[in-house]
Amino acid sequence: MTLFEAIVLGIVQGLTEFLPISSTAHLRIIPALAGWEDPGAAFTAIVQIGTLVAVLLYFWKDIFIIVAAVIEGIVQRKPLENSDAKMGWMIVAGTIPIVIFGKLFETQIDTTLRSLYWISGSLIGLAIILFLAEGKIKNRIKKELPLKAMENIGWKEALLIGLAQSIALIPGSSRSGVTITGGLFLNLDRATAARFSFLLSLPAVFAAGLYKLYQTWDIIVASPEHITNILVATLVAGIVGYASIAFLLNYLKKHTTTIFIAYRLVAGTAILYLVATGVLQP
């Protein structure tokens, strides 16, 4: 991997990590179209640490309040008395499914599921599901039924959205895409679904990044070039990711997810066509 490739892939990661269009799919397809080597699942997981930092910086006040409340609750032996502490524990509980499934299917995630057939199928399939979720929300708005804000999220919502997050282990599905979709099905308003999605990502992305960093450490440190490329890609991903968070949260306050649904359908269909015509190898 060249420094130029690292910068491009960092931009791609930052742009697509938080938009419901799948960063993994783009990190797989763009190198294939450009004739570059597949950076691999390990590269993707490590560079996600950059976007993790973007979430930490953007939501630092929320995170500080939640962590402080959790610690206070533990000290006072009343872990769930405070709503902020409860949110912290719900995020932890919502992370458990993806940790379990991620470990169980680690080999398939790193190999078989990176096939362009899987990626295109995930892009199209989740677009259809997001379309159905969007229709459900539009129907509630039309009937003037209430939608849930952050303070209305309970254990049911946290656990079900956490379970939905496990689907993101399939490249092409999009972690933010499946969690936002899950939130919409559970009647969260669009901006709240995105906000909770980003907070829920923290433990999973951090754990996956550290795990892959540990697994590939010897390869990374074997070459100064590898170290430089990883650091640059991670830094760029963080900077671009911060802007992506701000964009999506503001966008979803006034707009639907229709543009992302359309993009996923077009991208998934285009990938299938390119594979079928031999332009890309699956």
From Swiss-Prot:
GO CC annotations on file: plasma membrane
EC number(s) recorded for this UniProt protein: 3.6.1.27
Alphabetical keyword list: Antibiotic resistance, Cell inner membrane, Cell membrane, Cell shape, Cell wall biogenesis/degradation, Hydrolase, Membrane, Peptidoglycan synthesis, Transmembrane, Transmembrane helix
Summary of the function given for this chain in its UniProt record: Catalyzes the dephosphorylation of undecaprenyl diphosphate (UPP). Confers resistance to bacitracin.
Other facts: Bacitracin is thought to be involved in the inhibition of peptidoglycan synthesis by sequestering undecaprenyl diphosphate, thereby reducing the pool of lipid carrier available.
PANTHER family: UNDECAPRENYL-DIPHOSPHATASE
Family per record: Belongs to the UppP family.
Designated name of the protein: Undecaprenyl-diphosphatase
Species of provenance: Pelodictyon phaeoclathratiforme (strain DSM 5477 / BU-1)
Organism taxonomic ancestry: Bacteria, Pseudomonadati, Chlorobiota, Chlorobiia, Chlorobiales
